[in-house]
């Protein structure tokens, strides 16, 4: 019975993903072959609430973080805090003439974030919290912070994917932070939801 209910919920999410709406783009220069990533929203996402889809890197053809509408600001705040820590560590490295380091940061990113990915079909992982510790790396002039998460499908435990997002500059952080503006992105989604609610 529980499995049937879960399948029905995921089917609703799948319909929503297929009806995703483009909101805008953020830039990230970690992969020189692709520097522009989509930010979209769906009206029936996590917990059947409007959710934001942030395109990221991963092993599947399409890879997304999913943030429900109530967590947009907390996700933005998390990336802001991570940016400040990135700036701080770069300063420490420069002051101490450190040119090579690979270190796990004791600074977990908090916020309930799910994942969606697609190869031949869509898969979803909603039962985890994006709370793993990031890695900070310096090698020569390259300075990066990487979040990576192995995710497993809610509907099939044998379907897994690795998704990740890497920041190589303050500009990478700022581009994502700026588009995750609850006052604009959240207001846009709530406006669409409000219009839908008048037709009952």
Where are these regions (language model features)?
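Sec-dependent N-terminal signal peptides
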Residues: 1-17
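Positively charged, low-complexity terminal tracts
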Residues: 19-200
């Amino acid at each position: 019975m529980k499995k049937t209910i879960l399948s029905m919920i995921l089917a609703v999410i799948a319909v929503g993903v297929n009806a995703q709406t483009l909101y805008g783009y953020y830039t990230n220069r970690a992969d020189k072959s692709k520097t522009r990533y989509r930010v979209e929203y769906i009206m029936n996402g996590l917990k059947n609430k409007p959710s934001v889809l942030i395109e990221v890197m991963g092993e599947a053809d399409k890879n997304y973080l999913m943030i429900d509408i109530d967590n947009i600001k907390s996700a933005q705040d998390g990336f802001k805090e991570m940016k400040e820590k990135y700036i701080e560590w770069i300063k420490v490295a420069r002051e101490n003439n450190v040119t090579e380091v690979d270190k796990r940061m004791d600074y977990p990113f908090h916020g309930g974030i799910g994942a969606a990915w697609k190869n031949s079909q869509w898969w979803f992982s909603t039962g985890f919290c994006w709370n793993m510790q990031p890695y900070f790396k310096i090698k020569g002039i390259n300075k990066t912070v990487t979040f990576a998460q192995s995710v497993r499908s809610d509907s099939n435990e044998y379907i897994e994917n690795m998704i990740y997002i890497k920041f190589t500059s303050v500009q990478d952080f700022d581009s994502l932070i700026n588009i995750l503006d609850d006052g604009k992105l959240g207001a846009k989604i709530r406006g669409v939801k409000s219009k839908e609610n008048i037709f009952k």
